[in-house]
Each structure stands twice: as C-alpha cells, then as structure tokens.
C-alpha cells in the first residue's frame, strides 16, 4: 500500500519508439515457458534454476527496453486528480490527505481528529477494479476463452490494470496514474539482493514467485500475439515483461476480497484511496457494506490531526509481507516461521498415533508455525507434539475407555499434560528441531546485526537481511522457551507432582493461551494454493496448444518426519557447499 511506493516512480507519456521483432520475443518467451514448465529442481538446485530463468528474463527485458507505456511526472502529481475523481464518484475525501512519510512511503495523514471506530473512509463499488469489472471490459472476450484468467482472479486483475492503463480515456486513469511505478517485492530484487535470502525459509517462495511470474508472462505473450480475442486489446504491440511485473506487483500488494453485488460469493478487488493506508499491529477495521454497496473503514484507534492513519492488514508474517507486499514490518506481533512435522510411517506406533490425531482433526504430517510471541507454539502444534511423543500405553488411553473422548479434547490444552514424561519429551524434541533449523543458516544473529549496522545497504537488501535475522530470532526464542519448559516439567516429574485434573467445562482442543491458534493448519496460504492452480491450468493450456513438451511436477503434500529431517540435512550440506564456493558472498558479508 502506501509503504510499497517508497521507490522512485518513473513515468512518461507514451511508449518509446524502439522496435523489436515480435518473432524474436516469441522465440525467447517460448524458451522461457519451456524452462519454467520443466520438473522442479532437486535439493540444492533451486538457485541454479533461478539464475537460468533470470538470465532469460533479463535478455527479454533488455530487448524490450523503452517499449512500456508509462506516465509523465511524479506519482504524487496525480494525487489531486485521484481525490477529485474519488469525490465526484461518491468516495469520502474529507479528514485526510496523502503525504510522503519517508521511511514508510506515501500514506494517509489525518487533517482533523478522528476517534477510534469512527467511519472515516468509504469507497463505492463503481470505483473498484474487480474481476467482475474486468469481465465487463475489453478483456471480457479473452477472459471467456482463457482458462488461466478464469481460474486466477489475480492474473485477470493484472491484465485489467494493463488494458486500462493503456487506454487514456479509461474511467480508472486517475487511480492508475497514482500507483507506484515500481515496487519492492522480490520480483524487483537484484540478484545480489536475492542472494541475501540464501538458506532462509522465504527463499523457496521467492523462487516460486519469480518462476510463476515468468511462466505466466511467457504464456500470455503468445496468447496476446496469436489469440483472435486478443487482437483488439491495447497490449498486442506492447506487452513487456516490465509491464507484467508492474501489474502483478500492483495487484499482489493491493488486492482484497469483497463480496459480489448479490453477496453470494467473494471476488478480488483493487480499492482506490483505501490502499494508501500503511500497516500497524491491531485488528481488521475494514468491511463491506452490501446495503450501501461500498467498502468502509473505521479508525483503528484515535488519530489526532497531523498523525498518520494506519490500518491492520491481517495476521501476516514478515515473510508474507516481504514477498507479497514489498516491506518488512518491525515488531510484527504475528511474525512466525514454518516448521514441517510428520509422524514417520516406519514408526512402530504410527497407526495408533494417526488414529488419535485423526480424532483430534490433525493430519499426521503438516506445516505448523513457531511464533514470535510467547508461547511459541499453538494449541494445534502442542496437540500434535503430545501425540507424536506418546507411549503405547498413553495412546491406548486416548483411544479406549470411557474417558478417551475427554482426553482427545484436552490434547491442545496446555493446562492438562498427558504425563510429565510426555511434556519433557515434546519440549526436548522441539528444542532439538528448532536448533537443527538454526544450523541451516550461513550467518549468525550477531553477524546479521553487525552487517546491518556497518553497511550502506539498499532498501531491498535491508529487507532481505532483516527477514533472515527475524527467522533466526524466532527460532532462537523457541529453543530457549523449549529448554525452560523442558526443565520445568523434568522438575515436576522428579518431584512426582500430581497431574492437574480436568473438568468437563475446561475441555476444548483449541483452548490455550496462544492467539491465532488456527494459524498453523492454514499456513499453506492462498498464494501457495493459487500457485498450484495456476501451474496446473497453464500446463493444461500449454499442452493443448503444443507449447510445452516436458512434464510438470508438483508437491505431493507433506512428507514424513524422517524425510523432512533428511531434507534439512541436505539443505545444510548444500548451503555449506555454496558458502565455500561463492566468493562474492564471502566478500560482501
């Protein structure tokens, strides 16, 4: 949102006069599509694939230099037109102004005192760019024929944005002209800036984002050049990778879900004015009023005249903020790292553990989270770890007898341990696992802090190093917390303290002190699901059109604990090899 526009905005009136042969670009994009549709690389080979894809993309960018349609002047020059347009079409424009807040970029500043929970901003549907408005635009005929556009609302919005940007008479021109000219998402990172994310959890999503975007561009370049319904689009003579990267990032950093006009389902939308608000910790204070058919936002807190107006974007980790929003949020109370856990099928007690977990509604293998806040684990992760560490006798107690159901219900309740021994085992396991994850990083926490302090880094490089530092700090906190808990329960066991008794009124699988206890099970977020959908759809379409000869491999879900440990060992070994062979990394850091 506002924060994502910190970078310089480059604009000019029309596309440049440079020419490049469509056949030449078509040949390069076909090669790019082939590369991006090949099977996923093996462990330790992702960086090599990323560099190869990037090399092709840069070759295309170089040939297309000067062909994009951009605007004259600075972004802020268009803010008065945006406010006028919004006011004329029923949006609220009183009580705030758009201002550059330096570190956070552009945002909204209160021009009067605004009380907490006061409705201060509303934007009617007619101003929003939505999948529905895209279907009713010049993009409609192509949308009706293309399965990717139909399956992927975010891609539809990106093309809607590009088509309207190329139309000087577009209703949305005042909004589009006010958008940033570029972003700080990893799609804009230089190769050296991406290198700072080596060994982090986030790097895999960064690679995936870059590969997916390149594949989409390559696929749609051919569609625009060859599909009969693309003939009338204003993109045929000028559809550059730079254009697509900008549109994808604009949508990625700004898209939100709103209900359709009849309220029967949700659709994706870009919301002018509102998307200028920067993020802070808090609660969601934006909703959609179906009766008045408008997006409405109430104040998160009291804002005095002259103060920046913030909103809360949601319970996102810093990895999600960096990858999908293009900024790092210091002191993010919802920051977390992923931890893959699973019961090995070679475990002698696998069947019993799987049954107990199934009754608790927890899969035998999943991606959980370790949280920035205390306690570091959710009720669901606690329940999983308890089952993971159970003895045969403890498993029987949770499967048989009149109290079995009650025991299942208390698995996630931190007040009622299965046994002192079970608690010691689970906290020992978590301590060991978090320690193992920490060892996969090339640098230490102290080295990252020193590097940030002593080097003049770009905004994007700073974000990358802060992100890897944040991951390590969460893991280190988890190690320390697990060690404290391990010793506490060991003492309880040594003292033969009585186990707490539970009452029926205390039951509840997810009743614990951890906020967002449902987060770990939905950690495979919309972007991941959408990525698989998009890849499947593109592969089907490409095969149908004879564009791709190779196969496409997809993740088969989570693997066993044993497999995951093996992968982490390989990752650590691979990182060590990269570290020893990469002289530029050693010099820079």
Swiss-Prot record:
Q: Where is the SET domain?
A: 94-314
PTM section of the record: Phosphorylated by GSK3B, which is required for recognition by the SCF(FBXW7) complex and subsequent degradation. Ubiquitinated by the SCF(FBXW7) complex following phosphorylation by GSK3B, leading to its degradation by the proteasome.
Q: Which reactions does this protein catalyse?
A: L-histidyl-[protein] + S-adenosyl-L-methionine = N(tele)-methyl-L-histidyl-[protein] + S-adenosyl-L-homocysteine + H(+)
* UniProt entry keywords in alphabetical sequence: Actin-binding, Cytoplasm, Methyltransferase, Nucleus, Phosphoprotein, S-adenosyl-L-methionine, Transferase, Ubl conjugation
Residues the record lists as Phosphoserine modifications: 513
Residues annotated as transmembrane: none
The text the record gives for the protein's domains is:
The SET domain specifically recognizes and binds actin, suggesting that it does not accommodate substrates diverging from actin.
**The protein's name:** Actin-histidine N-methyltransferase
Q: Which organism is it from?
A: Dasypus novemcinctus
């Amino acid at each position: 949102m506002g924060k994502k526009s910190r970078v310089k905005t480059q604009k000019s009136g029309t596309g440049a006069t440079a020419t490049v042969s469509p056949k030449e670009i078509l040949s390069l994009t076909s090669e790019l599509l082939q590369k991006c549709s090949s099977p996923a690389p093996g462990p330790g080979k992702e960086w090599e694939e990323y560099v190869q894809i990037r090399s092709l993309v840069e070759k295309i960018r170089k040939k297309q230099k000067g062909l994009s349609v951009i605007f004259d002047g600075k972004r802020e020059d268009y803010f008065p037109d945006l406010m006028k347009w919004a006011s004329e079409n029923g949006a609220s424009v009183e009580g705030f102004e758009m201002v550059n807040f330096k570190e956070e970029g552009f945002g909204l500043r209160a021009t009067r005192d605004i009380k907490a929970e006061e409705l201060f901003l509303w934007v009617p549907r007619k101003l929003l760019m939505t999948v529905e408005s895209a279907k009713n635009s010049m993009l409609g005929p192509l949308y009706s024929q293309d399965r990717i556009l139909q399956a992927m609302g975010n891609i539809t919005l990106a093309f809607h944005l590009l088509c309207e940007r190329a139309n000087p008479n577009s209703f949305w021109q005042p909004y589009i002209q006010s958008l940033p000219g570029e972003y700080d998402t990893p799609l804009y990172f230089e190769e050296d800036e991406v290198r700072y994310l080596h060994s982090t959890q986030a790097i895999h999503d960064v690679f995936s984002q870059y590969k997916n975007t390149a594949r989409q561009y390559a696929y749609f370049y051919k569609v625009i050049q060859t599909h009969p319904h693309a003939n009338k689009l204003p993109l045929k003579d000028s559809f550059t990778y730079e254009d697509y990267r900008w549109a994808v990032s604009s949508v990625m950093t700004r898209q939100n879900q709103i209900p359709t006009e009849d309220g029967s389902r949700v659709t994706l939308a870009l919301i002018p004015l509102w998307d200028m608000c920067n993020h802070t910790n808090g609660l969601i204070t934006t909703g959609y009023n179906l009766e008045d058919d408008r997006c409405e936002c109430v104040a998160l807190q009291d804002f005095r005249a002259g103060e920046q107006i913030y909103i809360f974007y949601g319970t996102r980790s810093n990895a999600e903020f960096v990858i999908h929003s293009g900024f790092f949020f210091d002191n993010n109370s919802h920051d977390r790292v992923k931890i893959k856990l699973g019961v090995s099928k070679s475990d002698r007690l696998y069947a019993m553990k799987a049954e107990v977990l199934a009754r608790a509604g927890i899969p035998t293998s999943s991606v959980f989270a370790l949280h920035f806040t205390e306690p570091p684990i959710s009720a669901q992760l606690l329940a999983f770890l308890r089952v993971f560490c159970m003895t045969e006798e403890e498993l029987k107690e949770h499967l048989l007898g009149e109290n079995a159901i009650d025991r299942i219900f208390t698995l996630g309740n931190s007040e009622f341990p299965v046994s002192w021994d079970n608690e010691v085992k689970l906290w020992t396991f978590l301590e060991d696992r978090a320690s193992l994850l920490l060892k996969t990083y090339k640098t230490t926490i102290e080295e990252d802090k020193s590097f940030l302090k002593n080097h003049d880094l770009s905004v994007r490089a700073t974000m990358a190093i802060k992100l890897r530092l944040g991951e390590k700090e969460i893991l280190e906190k988890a190690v320390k917390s697990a060690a404290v808990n391990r010793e506490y329960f060991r003492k309880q066991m040594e003292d033969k303290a009585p186990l707490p008794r539970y009452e029926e009124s205390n039951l509840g699988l997810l009743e614990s002190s951890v906020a967002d206890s449902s987060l770990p099970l939905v950690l495979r977020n919309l972007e991941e699901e959408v990525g698989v959908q998009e890849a499947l759809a593109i592969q089907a379409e490409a095969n149908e059109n004879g564009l791709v000869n190779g196969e496409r491999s997809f993740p088969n879900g989570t693997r066993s604990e044993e497999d995951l440990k093996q992968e982490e060992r390989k990752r650590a070994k691979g990182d060590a090899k990269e570290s020893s062979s990469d002289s530029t990394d050693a010099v820079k850091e």
